[in-house]
Amino acid sequence: MARLAGVDIPNEKRIEIALTYIFGVGRTRAKETLAATGISPDIRVKDLTDEQLITLRDYLEANYKIEGDLRREVDADIRRKIQINCYQGQRHRKGLPVRGQRTKTNARTRKGPKRTVAGKKKATK
């Protein structure tokens, strides 16, 4: 397995797909990177030369914020929003959806498993 940006990328996949294993690199950014470095998107990772891997690594590090740097930046942005007490920060703090989604129903991923609350007892006749 080749390593790019501290991530093992699978040998059997096409390089266009394998690059998406790196946090911060999706399909579009992978295509842009390959076009800029002159590497065919159809080539498999195992068929890349060391020179091509070095070119890819240098291009990604020079032009994009990926992996650890990007994760730190995202975490810092969330902490800043929480600290300045803006609406999005309040939603992050409460563990609720941040971007305006409904919460009366759904939002289970963000809210966690359902906690049953005791309700009214039915009146017997």
UniProtKB/Swiss-Prot annotation:
Endpoints of the signal sequence: none
Keywords: Ribonucleoprotein, Ribosomal protein, RNA-binding, rRNA-binding, tRNA-binding
Pfam family, one: Ribosomal_S13
GO molecular function: rRNA binding; structural constituent of ribosome; tRNA binding
One Gene Ontology cellular component: small ribosomal subunit
One BP term from GO: translation
Region spans: Disordered: 90-125
Subunit structure, as described in the record: Part of the 30S ribosomal subunit. Forms a loose heterodimer with protein S19. Forms two bridges to the 50S subunit in the 70S ribosome.
NCBIfam families: uS13_bact
Similarity annotation: Belongs to the universal ribosomal protein uS13 family.
PANTHER family (alphabetical): 30S RIBOSOMAL PROTEIN S13/40S RIBOSOMAL PROTEIN S18, SMALL RIBOSOMAL SUBUNIT PROTEIN US13M
Record function comment: Located at the top of the head of the 30S subunit, it contacts several helices of the 16S rRNA. In the 70S ribosome it contacts the 23S rRNA (bridge B1a) and protein L5 of the 50S subunit (bridge B1b), connecting the 2 subunits; these bridges are implicated in subunit movement. Contacts the tRNAs in the A and P-sites.
HAMAP family listed in its UniProt record: Ribosomal_uS13
Protein name: Small ribosomal subunit protein uS13
Organism, as annotated: Bifidobacterium longum (strain NCC 2705)
Gene: rpsM
